[in-house]
């Protein structure tokens, strides 16, 4: 997979999930509304955090999004099913990048063309203190190693 959103980072696939395109996801233009793509990505992100036992805890710590982006490449329409692939970049002290691909699942059950790609910078915070904290070791173990630039 070529990582067009962050070409200098080697992509590390950590999660794949499928979900239906719902009738209510569409707007007056007859296609999935642009805001819904962020919901799809959010669901994939939280599904991965649940899978690795790092579900956000409002009374403790968890991830917050400080920047999110999405490139809309092809329209999605109801009915259909999508596959969302989640990739991660190397960790910082309290943050890492997540990248997502949204593909329409074909009639043959295989994921087809790329319809959207997006991502977010995730910062781990202590919610009551409203301060960033170091990433949990459970998350760091799942992220690709940090690459040092020449001369560093």
What does each of the following model-derived ranges do?
Residues 48, 52-54:
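Membrane-helix exit/interface motif
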Residues 37-40, 64, 121:
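Residue-level recognition of specific faces of alpha-helices
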Residues 59-80:
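Small beta-barrel nucleic-acid-binding modules, principally OB-folds
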Residues 1-17, 72, 76-79, 89-152:
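HotDog/MaoC-like acyl-thioester-processing domains
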């Amino acid at each position: 997979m070529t990582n067009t959103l962050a070409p200098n980072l080697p992509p590390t696939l950590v999660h794949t999930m499928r979900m239906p395109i719902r009738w209510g996801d569409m707007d007056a233009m007859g296609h999935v509304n642009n805001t819904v793509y962020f919901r799809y990505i959010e669901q994939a992100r939280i599904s991965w955090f649940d899978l690795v036992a790092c579900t956000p805890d409002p009374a403790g710590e968890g991830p917050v999004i400080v920047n999110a982006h999405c490139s809309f490449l092809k329209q999605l329409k109801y009915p259909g099913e999508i596959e969302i692939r989640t990739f991660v970049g190397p960790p910082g002290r309290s943050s890492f990048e997540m990248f997502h691909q949204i593909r329409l699942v074909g009639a043959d059950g295989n994921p087809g063309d790329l319809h959207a790609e997006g991502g977010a910078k995730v910062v781990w915070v202590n919610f009551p203190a409203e301060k960033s904290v170091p990433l949990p070791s459970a998350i760091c173990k799942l992220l690709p190693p940090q690459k040092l630039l020449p001369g560093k």
